[in-house]
């Protein structure tokens, strides 16, 4: 009788543990909706801007493209360098943890990028 009671207790405990684990994994909906999002980030006094396009999957940046819009040659050069460098830094990271500082010699363009990412977070947020 003792072994039978022990087996029932063990089986019940295992069943409850598995059920609790499954519930914990499915109870929390994703914070951001998967999809492709685009936003234009502003920065500087002129103002300057860049367009940022991201593919979001499970809250993680799967792809990032930055389109420069500067017309002053030096500014365009900095925006292009930033656009080439930023995917290597942010792809694979959670969107809610992405914030870029000076990168590829540019200190202004990251502000525009961060502004665009903020807008994209708002677009993708599940309400």
Walk through the language-model features, giving the residues of each:
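Bacterial N-terminal signal peptides that target proteins for export
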Residues: 1-10
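Bacterial N-terminal signal peptides
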Residues: 9-17
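Short acidic/polar alpha-helix capping motifs at helix-coil junctions
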Residues: 16-21, 63-66
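Boundary at the C-terminal end of the N-terminal hydrophobic targeting segment
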Residues: 22-26
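Active-site- and interface-proximal helix/loop "cap" or "latch" segments in soluble metabolic
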Residues: 28-127
